[in-house]
Amino acid sequence: DASTPHLDTYAAQRICKKSGAKLIHEVRDMWPITLLELGHMKKYNPFVFLIQCAENSFCKHADYVVSLLPYAKEYLIKHGMRDDKFRVSSNGIVLEEWKEQPSIPKEYDKVLKHLREEGKFIIGFLGSHTKSYALTYLIQAVQELDCLEIAVVFVGKGNQKEELKELASKKKCNNFYFLDPVPKSIIPTLAQRMDCLYVGAIHNDMFRFGICMNKLFDSMMSGKPILYAVDAPNNYVMDYHCGVSVEPESVEALEQGIRQLYTMSENEREELGQNGRQAVLEHFTYEKLAADFAALF
């Protein structure tokens, strides 16, 4: 059984009762509290009430509750889950996707070669160009640094892309490059052409339960240091010493983080990047995660 919006727990409970199977409920999204806090819906809204009853039911009746969010435990206990029912799982990477290294398109290769020939320090962002990832702060931080040796390469699309291009053009410096999205199979090769990778997010109260971003594991696997700007209690960048972690939505903090990575020696950056890659290989391949998951029960 999986979360959002929890109503399938009732059917799952009946099936398990008849078959004698164990009921394992996975929580990925925090419903209905997200509706209350971010959607500003009322506690006794009929839909919210319906989902809350379902959440209380799986907390009480599931044999185990599994979540990607390690800090959701106390919340779920308050809704009827026994302490010993909670298990934590994780997202990760498909190792086979990183074994093949397809070449990147010629126009992308041309841009990156040009930046490398000019001695640029390349910050990469690979993903959707939306407000969720706090990209305006990254652009403003680089502009404030006013350093011609730093370039940011954005690869992807999204509803904020034109706004970001406009912001990037406000200062007369050619630090920012916006490229179209590429197939997922090319992401590993492209990521490894950067000097560091940006992973950020705007503040979100729901992050207090923890966060598990696929983008972070891909970035760690690239072997490049990470500029990490996410406000969540679990922080793999700090845990595995694979980059620099800064306050999110802060131009000043991002400036400091960029400067710290830029002024490091290549050996220091290489060590950070390899720390992240090794952590993924040891803990976050889906083969390893599947074995760990099976051992939980």
Cite the ranges covered by each PLM segment:
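A short, well-ordered alpha-helix in the C-terminal region of glycosyltransferases
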Residues: A253, Q260, N267-E282, A295
